[in-house]
Amino acid sequence: MDIAIQHPWFKRALGPFYPSRLFDQFFGEGLFEYDLLPFLSSTISPYYRQSLFRTVLDSGISEVRSDRDKFVIFLDVKHFSPEDLTVKVQEDFVEIHGKHNERQDDHGYISREFHRRYRLPSNVDQSALSCSLSADGMLTFSGPKVPSGMDAGHSERAIPVSREEKPSSAPSS
């Protein structure tokens, strides 16, 4: 049984019809047509704001799954190469850091950096952790769980990011 753990603020009571501008801010992504023509969305209601209707795989949102046999983290890092990513395990936490220096794109210069930290369950076998980056930019961090009586082994170490040639098989929510 897979359990999808997501941040609670993404589960809105009214779904995509809830007028929220704070969570619809995607810095460095460019403007959409309705951003330039706000009167089109205000003809419906002055309080209505069109949602961006982005999927989990398209918005940079991470997904954590923990079932009886394994622990998996899916993270969209499509703007980063494996050389730009650092994955470390320190005690009960996995830290994923991505940074690429300033480079030129169609609109000028851009640089990106993120830092995510996740708590590992106590029964994850830290000696068997793996991390891979799919062709479509989905980082998958996974590790098997051990029975509760066995030692999971806690230490600090870096996890290498391997490159996969096929797209991710992560489910979109």
Curated annotation (Swiss-Prot):
Point out residues bearing the modification N-acetylmethionine.
M1
Modified residue Phosphoserine is at which positions? S45, S122
Binding-site list for Zn(2+) 1: H100, E102
**N6-acetyllysine is carried by which residues?**
K70, K99
Region Required for complex formation with BFSP1 and BFSP2: what ranges?
Answer: 1-63
Q: Which residues carry this modification: Deamidated glutamine?
A: Q6, Q50, Q90
Which residues of the sequence carry a binding annotation for Zn(2+) 3? H154
- Keyword list, A-Z: Acetylation, Chaperone, Cytoplasm, Eye lens protein, Glycoprotein, Metal-binding, Methylation, Nucleus, Phosphoprotein, Zinc
Subcellular localization is given as: Cytoplasm; Nucleus
Q: Which domain of life is it from?
A: Eukaryota
Give the family per the record: Belongs to the small heat shock protein (HSP20) family.
Please give the function described in this protein's UniProt entry.
Contributes to the transparency and refractive index of the lens. Acts as a chaperone, preventing aggregation of various proteins under a wide range of stress conditions. Required for the correct formation of lens intermediate filaments as part of a complex composed of BFSP1, BFSP2 and CRYAA.
List the protein's name: Alpha-crystallin A chain
